[in-house]
Every structure is written in C-alpha cells, then in structure tokens.
Amino acid sequence: MDKLQKTLEEWKEMLDPAQYSVCRLKGTERPFSGKYNDTKTAGVYHCICCNEALFDSTTKFDSGCGWPSFYAPLEGSAVVEVRDVSHGMIRTEVVCARCDAHLGHVFPDGPPPTGLRYCINSVCLELVPRE
C-alpha cells in the first residue's frame, strides 16, 4: 500500500470541519451522535480521508459506548495501533495505515473471537454497502 501524504492545509480543504477536527487533529465526536453508531447495513467501512477499506460490517457490534464498534479490522494492514498517552490516560490509538488519519481507539473489552473493541468515530468512515 502506498502512503498518502498531504499537508494539513490540503486536508483542511478536502474535509469538512468535523472530519478535519477528528481525523487530522485527533478529536472525538460526541457519543451517540455519529451516523454509523446504530447502522446495521451490510458493507465495508472505508477511511473518509483516503478511501482505504478498514472494517467489514460483519465485525461490527453494539457495545453501548456511543461509537461504532468492531471486534477486528480487515485482514492485513488496514489500521495501525499507536500508543496514546494524551489526556492523562494510556490508550491505544487506531489510525489509517494509508493516510495516518486518527480513527479512534482500541480497548481489550470486546466480544469473541478477538476480545477487542475498536471504538471508531463515524465521521472518519464512509460505508460502502454490499450489493
């Protein structure tokens, strides 16, 4: 996969303010506010910044946390996990492997088979429905 690199100004021009704030400045959308929180549509979730395929709807589950949750990313290297020590916490940030967009965080409290919960901001995603 080829890395996609742009300046912050270039990202700012192509993203709406909410997308830019979360994806490029590592913000977080308010819980239960995202368009994909309750979505049950079958398909593949892509990065809003670079269109890289990230998560399949078959791994999405209702965690009750207020953000779309998945128990695994797509096979391969769709996402990268990065140690995050911001806000006085130690967490694992999830970023797009292609463009380094901040997507959310992963926690060790998910369902089988992985036991992981990828807690992802809706604003970072674009769902491509299955036909």
From Swiss-Prot:
This is Peptide methionine sulfoxide reductase MsrB. Disulfide bonds: none annotated. Its EC number is 1.8.4.12. It is an enzyme of class 1 (oxidoreductase). GO terms for biological process: protein repair; response to oxidative stress. Zn(2+) binds at residues 47, 50, 96, 99. The active site is at residue 119. The keyword ATP-binding does not apply. The lineage of its organism: Bacteria, Pseudomonadati, Pseudomonadota, Gammaproteobacteria, Pseudomonadales. Belongs to the MsrB Met sulfoxide reductase family. Its cofactor is Zn(2+). It comes from the Bacteria. GO terms for cellular component: cytoplasm. PANTHER family: METHIONINE SULFOXIDE REDUCTASE, METHIONINE-R-SULFOXIDE REDUCTASE B1. The keyword Metal-binding applies. Gene3D superfamilies: Peptide methionine sulfoxide reductase. Keywords: Metal-binding, Oxidoreductase, Zinc. One of its GO terms (molecular function) is zinc ion binding.
